[in-house]
Amino acid sequence: MDPKKIARINELAKKKKTVGLTGPEKVEQAKLREEYIEGYRRSVRHHIEGIKIVDEDGNDVTPEKLRQVQREKGLHGRSLDDPES
């Protein structure tokens, strides 16, 4: 997210605590917060999709649901053509 938008979120939060927000400012704050949260969720999802879990013996123990997502995206050498990947 653009640093200017984050600064605006913080500015509106501070103003809300001190003098309150106008109607349009409340709408702007809600929109900016939703945009921030959506970006954060995308980032977390991207990181989780890139994780491969192995046990002490080196066996892949990645949960099947995550493996399926990785197959669809071709991550970690996984392929939809190879259900064992």
Swiss-Prot record:
Determine if Transferase is one of this entry's keywords. no
Question: Residues annotated as region Disordered?
Answer: 62-85
Question: Which spans of this chain does the record mark as coiled coil?
Answer: none
- Please give the GO cellular component terms listed in this UniProt entry: cytoplasm
Please indicate which superkingdom the organism of origin belongs to.
Bacteria
Membrane-crossing segments per the record? none
Claim: Cytoplasm is one of the keywords in the record: yes
Instruction: Write the record's keywords in alphabetical order, separated by commas.
Output: Cytoplasm
The record's InterPro entries line, in alphabetical order, gives: DUF896
Location comes to: Cytoplasm
Q: Which family does it belong to?
A: Belongs to the UPF0291 family.
Q: What is this protein called?
A: UPF0291 protein Sez_0489
Q: Which organism is it from?
A: Streptococcus equi subsp. zooepidemicus (strain MGCS10565)
